[in-house]
Amino acid sequence: MNSVDIGRCRKRIVQYIWDPEPRNDEEPDASIWCLGVEYAPQPQKITANTTPGKLGNYQDELEAGTSKIDDVTAHGWPEAFVSDFESKIWMTYRSDFPPIPRLDNDEANHPMTLTVRIRTQLMDPQGFTSDTGWGCMIRSGQSLLANAMLTLCLGRDWRRGDKAEEEARLLSLFADHPDAPLSIHRFVKYGAESCGKHPGEWFGPSATARCIEALSAQCGNIAPRVYVTNDTSDVYEDSFLRVARSGSGSIQPTLILLGTRLGIDNVTPVYWDGLKAVLQLPQSVGIAGGRPSASHYFIGTQGPHFFYLDPHTTRPAVPYSIDGRLLSKTEISTYHTRRLRRIHIQDMDPSMLIGFLVRNEDDWEDWKGRVGSVVGKQIIHVFKGEEATYNQGRRGALDEVEALDDA
């Protein structure tokens, strides 16, 4: 065994000990949900015509979490669910991208963690060429927006490998370059100008939602319209329709973003069923946030556990082409993973950004009916108008979802 093989084996052993892949053994009879789609908990039988001589061909894929020959059956997960999970766009930290200028004043430096400040001074004198250590909420927000756009462009049943050119064009909008309309550069620029968030500072759900709203509007018809609640999980129909309706009066595809806080240090148990129901709605495009000081993108649930995509992996930035060059198959693969991760709801941070994609009038009516009939305590309320709600008041409002603090 050569040194490369030894290094790979060591990496796999360390990962197995400190960050083992979850097994379907805690709630083996509970249905698995992924953004509104339900999967039977028991895996389908799959076979792999793999001989010992061919095993080495899959080592790189196994480490990247992209191989079809993996531990899906051994860990008890149905292949249909894992394929759906793998097809979701996974935005992560990136390195070696064009610098994001930093502000050289005490006010700008104060919000940064000590580690990021030292790294910036030593390695990035012209600005940030990586978002490692501070960009996870932006990446989670990009993931939410990208998957909403993916659903609009290619459909909810799309799976990785199909219509690669269309996917590549979508991903190019999020390239780590100042000219890409939905890049981290654009998020940071708008955050500094309009949200009081300096380059290198961790974004909260509220600032992320406002960036998504503004940047999507600048994209025209490429991105959906965006309705952002005022740091609450209350949705006002009159306000939503002003955003969603076109000149003809029909509802256009609209992304609903609700920034909320479901507790103080952890998600209050009374909201557990309501939060799980969020990812079971067919309009769901996921949840960004939800992990103390480390944002993730949550897309699935089984029992009390939530499945998520973790942005805390640093990969080289994908080159941005102004002449329309499409991403290669290898470059596209860096936006996907079969590596399942999950967390118990009691360990989630209560501050989060919840997203829904409403496509048309029927979808809007369906969504309203579903959020009003969830099991357990509701976390989302829909009202006709903000003024009427203010004048009438609402019994028990102080006992419900807390306003979001994005400080």
From Swiss-Prot:
One annotated GO molecular function: cysteine-type endopeptidase activity
Enzymatic class: hydrolase
GO cellular component, one term: phagophore assembly site
Residues annotated as the enzyme's active site: C136, D310, H312
Alphabetical UniProt keywords: Autophagy, Cytoplasm, Hydrolase, Nucleus, Protease, Protein transport, Thiol protease, Transport
InterPro entries in alphabetical order: Papain-like_cys_pep_sf (IPR038765), Peptidase_C54 (IPR005078), Peptidase_C54_cat (IPR046792)
EC number from the UniProt entry: 3.4.22.-
Compartments, as annotated in UniProt: Cytoplasm; Nucleus; Preautophagosomal structure
Null mutant phenotype: Impairs autophagy.
Signal peptide, first to last residue: none
Transmembrane segments: none
Catalytic activity, as annotated: [protein]-C-terminal L-amino acid-glycyl-phosphatidylethanolamide + H2O = [protein]-C-terminal L-amino acid-glycine + a 1,2-diacyl-sn-glycero-3-phosphoethanolamine
Main location: cytoplasm
GO biological process, one term: protein processing
Role noted for this protein: Cysteine protease that is required for autophagy. Plays a key role in cytoplasm to vacuole transport (Cvt) and autophagy by mediating both proteolytic activation and delipidation of atg8. The protease activity is required for proteolytic activation of atg8 by the cleavage of the C-terminal amino acid of atg8 to reveal a C-terminal glycine. Azg8 ubiquitin-like activity requires the exposure of the glycine at the C-terminus for its conjugation to phosphatidylethanolamine (PE) and its insertion to membranes, which is necessary for autophagy.
Similarity comment: Belongs to the peptidase C54 family.
Annotated protein name in UniProt: Probable cysteine protease atg4
Organism: Aspergillus oryzae (strain ATCC 42149 / RIB 40)
